[in-house]
């Protein structure tokens, strides 16, 4: 799952402005806070 999340990371940053400093935790958990 980490690979998929890493690939969608830029998409999350664009679609989910709510994630900023939590990006690292997002990749670690593999879950979207949005």
Swiss-Prot record:
Keyword RNA-binding: no
Residue numbers covered by the propeptide annotation in the UniProt entry: 1-10, 18-34
Processing and modification events after translation: Processed by the macrocyclase-peptidase enzyme POPB to yield a toxic cyclic heptapeptide. POPB first removes 10 residues from the N-terminus. Conformational trapping of the remaining peptide forces the enzyme to release this intermediate rather than proceed to macrocyclization. The enzyme rebinds the remaining peptide in a different conformation and catalyzes macrocyclization of the N-terminal 7 residues.
UniProt keyword Transmembrane present: no
Stored InterPro entries: Amanitin/phalloidin
GO molecular function: toxin activity
Keyword terms of this UniProt record: Toxin
Residues in cross-link Cyclopeptide (Ala-Pro): 11-17
Tissues where this protein is expressed: Expressed in basidiocarps.
Role of this protein: Probable toxin that belongs to the MSDIN-like toxin family responsible for a large number of food poisoning cases and deaths.
Family: Belongs to the MSDIN fungal toxin family.
NCBIfam families registered for this protein in UniProt: amanitin
Identification of the protein by name: MSDIN-like toxin proprotein 7
